[in-house]
């Protein structure tokens, strides 16, 4: 289901109750690769954004994962849920383009995505579709 338009749908994803306690449970059980995907200041590591791969392995994400696979991956291509999180306001990604379509769902907090000079605000339950090869940057307005 390929779409070449950036689309933001407000409140359309039924997300689980999620907070930083739930995040620690996911980190503790998923065994997914984790990293700081952007440059950071050595003395302020906790102000960075963090990335956790394969979050779909945790039961809290099974219903979202199954729904996304049914709606957006009809050919069963390799896919995953990647969590991006930050403990402080202002964490951001580098501007980048992905080689595949990206669907971002708001789980916790507020994030602004800058895409083609436009700002898209994503909060809990929102779904943002970013077509492949589209340059975008996420900026956390609150911890997320």
Predicted ranges, named:
Residues 1-26:
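An N-terminal JmjN-like helical accessory module and its immediate linker preceding a catalytic domain
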Residues 12, 131-132:
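Proline-centered helix-kink/hinge sites
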Residues 28-127, 134-144:
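Active-site region of the double-stranded beta-helix
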């Amino acid at each position: 289901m390929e779409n070449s338009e950036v689309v933001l749908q407000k409140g359309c994803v039924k997300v689980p109750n999620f907070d930083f306690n739930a995040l620690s449970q996911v980190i503790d059980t998923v065994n997914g690769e984790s990293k700081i995907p952007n440059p950071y200041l050595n003395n302020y590591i906790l102000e960075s954004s963090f990335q956790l791969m394969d979050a779909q392995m945790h039961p809290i994400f099974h219903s979202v994962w199954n729904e996304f696979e049914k709606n957006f991956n009809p050919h069963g291509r390799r896919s995953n849920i990647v969590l991006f999180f930050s403990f402080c306001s202002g964490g951001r990604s580098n501007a980048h383009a992905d080689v595949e379509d990206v669907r971002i769902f708001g789980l916790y907090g507020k994030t602004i995505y800058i895409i083609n000079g436009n700002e898209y605000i994503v909060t809990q339950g929102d779904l943002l579709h970013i077509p492949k090869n589209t340059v975008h940057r996420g900026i956390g307005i609150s911890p997320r």
